[in-house]
Design a protein with these regions (language model features):
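N-terminal basic/disordered segments at the start of proteins
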Residues: 1-52, 262, 273
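Small-residue-enriched alpha-helical segments and adjacent helix-cap loops
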Residues: 9-14, 36-202, 208-212, 221, ...
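Short, flexible, solvent-exposed loop/turn segments with mixed acidic/basic and small polar residues
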Residues: 26-32, 65-71, 225-228
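Long insertion/accessory domains within large nucleic-acid-processing enzymes
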Residues: 167-172, 259, 266-267
């Protein structure tokens, strides 16, 4: 590659949010002698208005290359390619005109990322956007001024379907869960078995897969074998259930998440080149997600103190 990464480049007061990129042959390619990347913090749940997106695109067309990436693996809006003199101009317009902040880069807390949560999803076990926003504001210094030995990520999944893949991509993963029984509507179960309701919300209706077989498609695929279907009734052995969501996804009109809701906190997901990808390890099986989130912050700060010494 002809790109030189890094370098001391950024905006005043921030140690992250800008990734310096320089061409190693500026005489041959003067147009991309500087081609810095800027990371812009995404809104909660990635909800946008078309006006907002147009404003960002107009700004980047005017002061950058016009090339964007929606989104980076951390979730940020990625602005690809601008010059050093434009960085402060872009930052000023983002913050003063569009009320928008930069995201994280380098050895800092990366921009927290969440799923749509309770705004749209019936399976969300806690308000992902409220928790994500609260922690983003709480840890502004850690986000904008790198002080860690290595990057650190929060990700928030409202349920175990894990739409932002928190369990695979975060140093602390917040995965929604519940403590009580899955709620079963036996009449709706019978409707699925009888073919009245399409399984999987009708997502596989493009071809004829044959009649729905609850034993084959639900019971036998339960990872802990905690389900049974006998005499027209579905039963679940709750202590053995791992909340994998498969049965709920297949029969969403018959099964619902429980009412005693919160989240599990897991730590340590990473993908080192030599060792290969590693999923998060369960740290806190269940914690209530309630403002002001003091119990959650206590776990975070204990983990953060350890990370300052051991992170790599």
């Amino acid at each position: 590659t002809h790109w030189k990464h890094g370098g001391i480049v950024g905006v005043f007061g921030y140690g992250g949010g800008v990734i310096g990129r320089y061409c190693d042959q500026p005489e041959m390619f003067p147009g991309v002698a500087h081609f810095h990347t800027m990371r812009v913090a995404q809104p909660g749940g990635k909800f946008y208005t078309t006006e907002y997106l147009r404003n960002l695109c107009d700004l980047w067309d005017f002061r950058g290359s016009g090339i964007t990436n929606m989104h980076g693996s951390t979730g940020d809006i990625i602005f690809l390619g601008t010059t050093t003199p434009q960085l402060e101009e872009i930052f000023y317009e983002l913050t003063h005109k569009y009320n928008q902040d930069l995201g994280g880069s380098g050895s800092n807390l990366r921009t927290p990322s969440d799923c749509v949560g309770e705004a749209r999803c019936e399976w969300s076990c806690y308000d992902t956007q409220a928790l994500c926003y609260n922690l983003t504001i709480e840890y502004q210094d850690e986000l904008h001024r790198p002080a860690f030995p290595y990057k650190f990520k929060f990700k928030f999944d409202g349920c175990p379907n894990s739409c932002v893949a928190a369990i695979a991509r975060a140093d602390i993963s917040f995965v929604g869960t519940w403590k009580d029984d899955i709620k079963i509507d036996q009449e709706a179960v019978a409707a699925y078995v009888g073919g009245e309701f399409p399984p999987n919300g009708g997502s596989h209706a493009g071809r004829d897969w044959g009649p729905f077989d609850i034993q084959k498609e639900v019971i036998d695929l339960c990872p802990t074998e905690c389900m049974r279907y006998k005499d027209g009734k579905l039963g679940i052995n709750t202590p053995e259930c791992t909340r994998c969501m498969h049965c709920i996804n297949v029969m969403p009109r018959a099964l619902r998440i429980g009412d005693d809701r919160g989240c599990s906190m897991l730590v340590g997901a990473k993908a080192p080149i030599l060792d290969g990808a590693q999923m998060s390890t369960l740290l806190v099986p269940f914690i209530k997600v309630e403002e002001p989130y003091d119990e959650i912050k206590e776990v975070i700060e204990t983990s953060g103190n350890w990370w300052m010494e051991e992170g790599r």
